Amino acid sequence: MLNTLIVGASGYAGAELTAYLNRHPHMNITGLAVSAQSADAGKLLSELHPQLKGILDLPLQPLVDVAQAAKGIDVVFLATAHEVSHDLAPQFLAAGCVVFDLSGAFRVRDAAFYSQYYGFEHQHPDWLDKAVYGLAEWQSEDIKQAQLIAVPGCYPTASQLALKPLVDGQLLNDAQWPVINAVSGVSGAGRKASMGNSFCEVSLQPYGLFTHRHQPEIVAHLGTPVIFTPHLGNFARGILATITCRLKAGVTAQNIADAYHHAYQNKPLVRLYQQGVPALKAVVGLPFCDIGFSVQGEHLIIVATEDNLLKGAAAQAVQCMNIRFGFPETQSLL
């Protein structure tokens, strides 16, 4: 059994993560933690997330002394704000823990990225170099050797799973950037109350035009420029990305289907549609990314869907953990 500490368990993704790990046969949850200043400190997780009542009636402990909290811990999951993960991860790593960070604090190796897109100066370039980007279907060999796994963002997961087989297969016309229009549920903004996310205010609205931090994350790991426009939808959870591309001359729908099949035929958490495209309802509450496409001449439209809290966060973190420790990849997820 691996002793596990979850920091940031009070949030939406943190609660989903805790539920997955609670039913994992090789994980022992030794503690749930929140920041010392958190209003949730001292409460039961099931008070904040009633669906866990009678299942996870565990207290949320204030994290005061990292060195003390790390004693006897094998695995740490950080479902915390970017700046918090930036400060905490190196301390847990120094204590010998394997860390899975769900924030953006270690996803991109360029330190300048963080001052531009996250608003803080990165102080740990050594860990930026050592961190492995946890896009599970594509980085499994590196994940197996890593001490720090940076779990990808929700939008980048859907976008890269949809595009990477085609980029790597050199099937796209380089003269035209892929255009990603993605809609996310309000849970992507977290539990903290805000006027813009309140019931009567939330609408279907684009945001972060040309400035969203997930755009350079996608570009850094996909290896090709893209235009990315996120949208906030008036629903609780899930992401649907519609991606338009131009194909190289002579590339057919069968070439696209073959590329996807080759990439994901043995990847159980990516589901490919032979006909039609996925709807959001097929993935909400499940750990899958569903992908479908349509071709007309040299034009390609891809639709990718996922639950932003699961394949876009908690489920992928557990998937990475399973890969890292040699467990079945879908253990506790299916």
From Swiss-Prot:
GO terms for biological process: L-arginine biosynthetic process. Its main location: cytoplasm. InterPro entries: AGPR_AS, AGPR_type-1, NAD(P)-bd_dom_sf, NAGSA_dehydrogenase, Semialdehyde_DH_NAD-bd. GO terms for cellular component: cytoplasm. It is found in: Cytoplasm. The keyword Oxidoreductase applies. Its EC number is 1.2.1.38. It is an enzyme of class 1 (oxidoreductase). Coiled coil: none annotated. GO terms for molecular function: N-acetyl-gamma-glutamyl-phosphate reductase activity; NAD binding; NADP+ binding. The active site is at C154. Catalyzes the NADPH-dependent reduction of N-acetyl-5-glutamyl phosphate to yield N-acetyl-L-glutamate 5-semialdehyde. HAMAP family: ArgC_type1. This is N-acetyl-gamma-glutamyl-phosphate reductase.
